[in-house]
Amino acid sequence: MAKDMDTIVSLAKHRGFVFPGSDIYGGLSNTWDYGPLGVELKNNVKKAWWQKFITQSPFNIGIDAAILMNPKVWEASGHLNNFNDPMIDNKDSKIRYRADKLIEDYMQDVKGDENFIADGLSFEQMKKIIDDEGIVCPVSKTANWTEIRQFNLMFKTFQGVTEDSTNEIFLRPETAQGIFVNYKNVQRSMRKKLPFGIGQIGKSFRNEITPGNFIFRTREFEQMELEFFCKPGEEIEWQNYWKTFASDWLTSLNMSSENMRLRDHDEDELSHYSNATTDIEYKFPFGWGELWGIASRTDFDLRKHAEHSGEDFRYHDPETNEKYIPYCIEPSLGADRVTLAFLCDAYDEEGVEGSKDARTVLHFHPALAPYKAAILPLSKKLSGEAIKIFEQLSSKFSIDFDESQSIGKRYRRQDEIGTPYCVTFDFDSLEDNQVTVRDRDSMEQVRMPISELEAFLTEKTKF
């Protein structure tokens, strides 16, 4: 079925996945709050990433670096001078756009070219396309544009009691630099030999010119990043390894491979620090969008921090007796983006035999579902006994307890929030200590001893 973004956003708000930020005060543009189900879903996504990329990896370990860092970090990394987007303003609407995204949206929506990439084009090349194609502002419908200029994406603030340049600091625009500046601390304290990786999950902030598409592009967002260090010359081999590993992680959590593609960056599109980058893209209802960037950052970051800090980041190879600055592969994934992708991928509307109404269902992998099961007493008279099952299971799983309305309406409600199993406690349960377990996807029902529920859910939530 063709999926509509407005319908998915409406469901997310209605069912408590995501709410507009500061809603009672009219909101704040491009801010979103995760509701009770959204925070469970996103936490499960982060848990699944950490499990496979850190806990179960023989190579990788984790850290949690500070959001606020010495400004010299951003000077060394190049963010102060190079972390910019091409900005263009429409003189009539007074609205500001990212020039590259304005062109890409036009090429996709008007020309039908989903593969056109403007990133990497010069200002002159982008302005020529805008002028030659007669691209207009979506609001004013005019082509009365300013010249394209650079716009730095970093949020600036001040530390201390006075707001002057000596106290100027920045909210981090990426989590990666917190890993690079801790490279020696981690490598020495954990006695790691190459190859090895350092991963973390954390908030980052970018003053995006044109954020949008719900939680896909926001100014405050969460990243799940791994910096994997290896011997120079082995970086492409490891980049291919992490491309496959990342793709397999997505499909192991039931993301449809038909909605995924790998796209290699052209040479003129590569970031200044990269000699190879591949994006894993997902086909959202609004078009293809980047989920995961897997970049070979060479030795750029460690070398720059060595130059600016005076620290020696060379690795002494015990096998060859060489000294060299390691190369780095960075698989960088947006937690909000991939949560949105799992939400879009799971959404479905299905016809039900014997009913004229379609059911809305979220086909989440059980490991990601906000609730692993819902306990449903057939009658409120049975709630006292049914709640005991909730208490038994909720120490290990996220479980819902729902006793209101008919059992059919409760099934539909649980389908709509992606609960994989409904456990119905009926009057027979009082006698035989068994319950009816309904599968969300097949709608099939089986009778099961209460004593087997924990083992059943443990097995089903593996991935």
Curated annotation (Swiss-Prot):
GO molecular function: ATP binding; catalytic activity, acting on a protein; glycine-tRNA ligase activity; protein dimerization activity; transferase activity
Residues the entry annotates as binding ATP: 206-208, 216-221, 290-291, 334-337
Catalytic activity: tRNA(Gly) + glycine + ATP = glycyl-tRNA(Gly) + AMP + diphosphate
Position of the signal peptide: none
Annotated compartments: Cytoplasm
Superkingdom as given in the UniProt entry: Bacteria
Family affiliation: Belongs to the class-II aminoacyl-tRNA synthetase family.
Described function: Catalyzes the attachment of glycine to tRNA(Gly).
Record-given protein name: Glycine--tRNA ligase
Organism encoding this protein: Staphylococcus aureus (strain bovine RF122 / ET3-1)
